[in-house]
Amino acid sequence: MIKLTQKWWGVVAVALLCFAPSAFANSNLTMTGAGNNVMDGVYVGPYYATVNGVANSPVICDDFADESYIGSSWNITTNNFSTLGSALWGNQTQNYEAAAWLTLQMLSLNGNSSNATQVGYLSFAIWSLFDKSALNGLNSTQLAGVDSWLSKVPSNLTPGEFANFVILTPQGCKNGPGSCPGQEFLMMVPEGGAAALYLLFAGLSCFGAMLLRRRRQAPSATSSMA
C-alpha cells in the first residue's frame, strides 16, 4: 500500500519535471568517465558526468551524430516527455519512450561484467532509434543482437511510465544533430520525493581529451565511445 505522503511526493516530482526545462535552462554538463566497455570501436553503456554540480551521474547517450570528450563541458537544457519539441530529436515520442525503456534494461544489466555484450547491443539499439547510420559498422551477429532488443520494446509504452527520466539536450547546436558541442543524454532521477528534491537542488546548484563516440583507438582495443 502506498502512503498518502508518497503519492503526493510523486505528484510534486512530476510537477517539477514539467517545469524542469525552464528551471534548468542554463544547466551544465561535464563528461567525467565512460567505463571500459567497447563494441565496434565505440564505448558503450552508461557514461558518467557531473550534471548541475552532481558528480558521477550515470547518463545514457542517444546521440550518435555528435561527439563528446572526457573533461569537456557544455550547457544543456533539461527536457522531459512533455517538452520533446525542445529535445535534440524533436517530437519523436515513440522513439524516446523506446530509448527510455532500453535504458532501463541496460541499467539492470550493467552491474555484471558478463552482460557487457548485451549492454553494447542496447547502446546501439538506442542510437539506431534516431540514427540508423550507427549500425553501419556492426557485423551480422551484432546486428542480430541489436534487432533482438528492438523487437522486445513494448508497443504500448506511455510517457507517464518515464516520469523519472530527464533528457539532457545540448545547447548551441547550429544545425541540429551533428552540429552540437556535445551529445544528448538520458538520465534517471530518483523516484518519488527524492526526484523532487533532486530537481530542486540540482537546479540551484580536466581530464585528458578522450573521444566518446567516433570510432578511434581506445586502450587495448580498436575502440571509441558513444
How would you describe each model-predicted region?
Residues 207-226:
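C-terminal membrane-anchoring or membrane-association module
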Residues 21-25:
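Sec/Tat signal peptide C-region and signal peptidase I cleavage site
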Residues 11-20, 203-204:
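Bacterial N-terminal signal peptides
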